């Protein structure tokens, strides 16, 4: 028995050393990429991370930020396949000449819905739609995507994300970090962190994690008056609506797992600061320093989202009737927890 315990301890130490070594390697590569990146300075005259969403209870969760008129229109024509990313993806051009990035895999439904809820809270997102089935003309001799597009060029269950024309996009080493941006300490940034935790988005990597793929970016938009606005946003909401946690325990699009963590969504409130149960890629940056007043400000918008909107958004994102019912109830429970904080200042 003592020999077995010794062996187990040695194995555990070896695994721990291996994990630490991998993370140190990723950190070093990310640091190198950021330091050696060719400068792409932000050209905007102002920065934004949030805008007033208006009458939240009237927003169309089925169509999302792009609206019904913004949906992809067939026929779709193959443009190129992408080798990056954890899931198969390619670009297509639709009947209106717009380019879409098409993705398959376990993030399709969660990402499509998560962008709708973040949008309803006032945050910038990329326009995304769920397309149940279709055909991509010219999609032959594919690599990874060959498992998602048949020999007849037909596909099922895809997320179409618009590649918006005229927008200058700063990705990866040119993005932003949770602890270094123009909004540090503001209610707008803290509100975004709450949305991340509300949706159980455990993959909140930023520019410091560029070796593994940063999920933050800056999009420069030219406004009607000619002003260039730099919009700070999260560009990957796929790792949501499941369980947060350490590697090996996380999940995506898993209602039972998502619901099982509702009781630990908020741990408590002390001296006006909220304590959270969330664990993700950047746990400390997501959870620290969020006050009751931050939650009250955010709930002015999120609190107006109706169950009907949640359900319609989920169904439009590919959820089954059962999944839509489960997620609607589970999300409402978390929103009710935020409401309780707003009312009592405690939990």
Regions inferred by a protein language model and the residue ranges of each:
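Extracytoplasmic/periplasmic, Sec-exported soluble proteins
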Residues: 84, 106-110, 183-190, 286-290, ...
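Extracytoplasmic/secreted envelope proteins and their assembly/folding machinery
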Residues: 89, 111, 115, 192-195, ...
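C-terminal catalytic region of ATP-dependent kinase domains
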Residues: 221-347
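Short linear motifs in intrinsically disordered
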Residues: 2, 71-84, 265-269, 301
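Short polybasic/polar patches that bind polyanions
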Residues: 119, 200, 315
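Regulatory N- and C-terminal appendages and interdomain linkers associated
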Residues: 2-78, 94, 307-347
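Conserved kinase catalytic-core segment
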Residues: 108-111, 116, 171-248
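Conserved ATP-binding subdomain of kinase catalytic cores across diverse folds
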Residues: 66-175
């Amino acid at each position: 028995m003592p020999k077995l315990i010794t062996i187990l301890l040695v194995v555990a130490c070896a695994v721990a050393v291996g994990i630490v070594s991998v993370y140190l390697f990723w950190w070093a590569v990310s640091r190198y990429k950021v330091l050696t990146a060719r400068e792409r300075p932000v050209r905007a005259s102002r920065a934004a991370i949030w805008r007033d969403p208006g009458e939240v209870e009237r927003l169309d969760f089925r169509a999302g930020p792009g609206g019904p008129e913004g949906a992809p229109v067939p026929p779709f024509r193959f443009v190129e396949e992408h080798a990056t990313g954890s899931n198969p993806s390619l670009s297509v051009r639709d009947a209106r000449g717009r380019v879409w990035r098409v993705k398959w895999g376990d993030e399709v439904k969660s990402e499509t819905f998560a962008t709708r809820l973040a949008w309803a809270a006032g945050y910038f997102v990329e326009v995304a739609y769920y397309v149940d089935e279709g055909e991509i003309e010219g999609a032959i001799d594919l690599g990874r995507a060959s498992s998602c597009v048949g020999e007849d060029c037909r596909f099922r269950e895809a997320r179409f994300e618009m590649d918006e024309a005229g927008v200058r996009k700063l990705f990866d080493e040119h993005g932003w970090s949770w602890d270094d941006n123009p909004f540090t300490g503001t209610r707008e940034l803290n509100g975004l962190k709450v949305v991340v935790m509300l949706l159980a988005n455990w993959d909140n990597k930023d520019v410091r994690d560029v070796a593994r793929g940063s999920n933050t970016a800056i999009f420069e938009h030219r406004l009607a008056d000619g002003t260039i606005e730099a919009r700070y946003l999260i560009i990957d909401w796929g790792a949501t609506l499941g369980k947060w946690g350490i590697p090996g325990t996380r999940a995506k699009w898993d209602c039972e797992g998502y619901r099982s963590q509702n009781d630990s969504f908020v741990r408590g409130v002390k001296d006006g600061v909220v304590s959270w149960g969330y664990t993700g890629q950047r746990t400390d940056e997501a959870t620290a320093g969020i006050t009751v007043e931050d939650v009250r400000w955010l709930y002015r918008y999120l609190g107006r989202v109706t169950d009907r909107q949640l359900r319609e958004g989920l169904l439009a994102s590919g959820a089954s009737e059962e999944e839509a019912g489960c997620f609607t109830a589970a999300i409402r429970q978390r929103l009710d927890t935020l409401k309780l904080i707003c009312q009592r200042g405690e939990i």
